[in-house]
Amino acid sequence: MRFETLQLHAGYEPEPTTLSRQVPIYPTTSYVFKSPEHAANLFALKEFGNIYSRIMNPTVDVLEKRLAALEGGKAALATASGHAAQFLALTTLAQAGDNIVSTPNLYGGTFNQFKVTLKRLGIEVRFTSREERPEEFLALTDEKTRAWWVESIGNPALNIPDLEALAQAAREKGVALIVDNTFGMGGYLLRPLAWGAALVTHSLTKWVGGHGAVIAGAIVDGGNFPWEGGRYPLLTEPQPGYHGLRLTEAFGELAFIVKARVDGLRDQGQALGPFEAWVVLLGMETLSLRAERHVENTLHLAHWLLEQPQVAWVNYPGLPHHPHHDRAQKYFKGKPGAVLTFGLKGGYEAAKRFISRLKLISHLANVGDTRTLAIHPASTTHSQLSPEEQAQAGVSPEMVRLSVGLEHVEDLKAELKEALA
């Protein structure tokens, strides 16, 4: 089935008791076992089923199956936020003494999580240059490297990594490539797994949920990576919490997603609630329709901003002058997301003054809403970084970031024109 059909139907058939057409919300903590044997089998991972909603919930299960279908993956795991998803993904593969190789073209919160929080746990994150070439990742990789990390579109640098080349190099080295595909809109604009990525993460808060109403995240497992190569002892060695069970022997290429759920999610507890999952599912039903309008408005505004005398530059991969425009065509089929950045000629103060004049456009720290959003990254999302780190992440003092919504584009232009005056 095609994306537009999957976003409505994947992962759910009317449940037999009420025959509800809409996915029911299951606000329960726990589930009655059929027998002592049934309970024992569930806890021993001899069969799958519901035990406790920190690990699995029927409403959340529909979301996971639907997202996996949209991304072309084999399984998914929903989490309480996008940050929770990436933390869970990395700590499922890496432990103290291990390392991750990452692009520096990251959302500011991710950069801080990598540089500060993971370091405190003994996991080193090694950063490439902003060029994020495969040879840079290879040069930083050793026997303790557990993953390579990129964003499908860097936030807010708006670079597009060469996913095919990175995935090929990673697999030749036996390393899992993980792609934060939040800007890929749930797989509608881009499916990294199809280009060779092993895992995908999402902040479902953004375009998938799409209405600024709920915080949620997810990991999608492509089920296509050979974890047995010797690089992933956390997946191949006997599991002390399950009487020496070897996950790769029991679950094969799904060993990662099983461990993330029954070990990581069980112990760390970053579970998504059923109501939040249902809100994301409701947003997901119109994802393809919203995505088209988001991209159309963004491209229109990017061209318009280029013509404004107060604007020094405009950065959007859909513009012909963008250094990764060819990759936007290859990977995103000419629809590279709904975020653009631009610089004001007056620098830092001009950017803050512009933000203060906005009325229709919301000044807040989010992207992927139905409404258009604006922020000044240097003084907010990336303010915890040094000037050198900001520059490395693609942030400059004069930069404004726009997450373009679904409003009529002429109304957005009128708002921007007034704020620029």
Curated annotation (Swiss-Prot):
Record-linked PANTHER family: HOMOCYSTEINE/CYSTEINE SYNTHASE, HOMOCYSTEINE_CYSTEINE SYNTHASE
Disulphide bond pairs: none
EC number: 2.5.1.-
Keywords (A to Z) from UniProt: Amino-acid biosynthesis, Methionine biosynthesis, Pyridoxal phosphate, Transferase
Chain's role: Catalyzes the conversion of O-acetyl-L-homoserine (OAH) into homocysteine in the methionine biosynthesis pathway. Has weak activity with O-acetyl-L-serine, O-phospho-L-serine, L-serine, O-succinyl-L-homoserine and L-homoserine. Shows low CTT beta-lyase activity and very low CTT gamma-synthase activity.
Name this protein carries in UniProt: O-acetyl-L-homoserine sulfhydrylase 1
Alphabetized InterPro entries for the sequence: Cys/Met-Metab_PyrdxlP-dep_enz, OAc-hSer/O-AcSer_sulfhydrylase, PyrdxlP-dep_Trfase, PyrdxlP-dep_Trfase_major, PyrdxlP-dep_Trfase_small
Gene name in the database record: oah1
N6-(pyridoxal phosphate)lysine: modified positions: 206
Catalytic activity: O-acetyl-L-homoserine + hydrogen sulfide = L-homocysteine + acetate
Cofactor(s) needed for function: pyridoxal 5'-phosphate
pH-dependent activity: Optimum pH is 7.8. Shows high pH stability over a wide range of pH (pH 4-12).
Complex formation: Homotetramer.
Gene Ontology molecular function terms on file: cysteine synthase activity; O-acetylhomoserine sulfhydrylase activity; pyridoxal phosphate binding
Summary of temperature dependence: Optimum temperature is 70 degrees Celsius. Very stable at high temperature. 90% of the activity is retained after treatment at 90 degrees Celsius for 60 minutes.
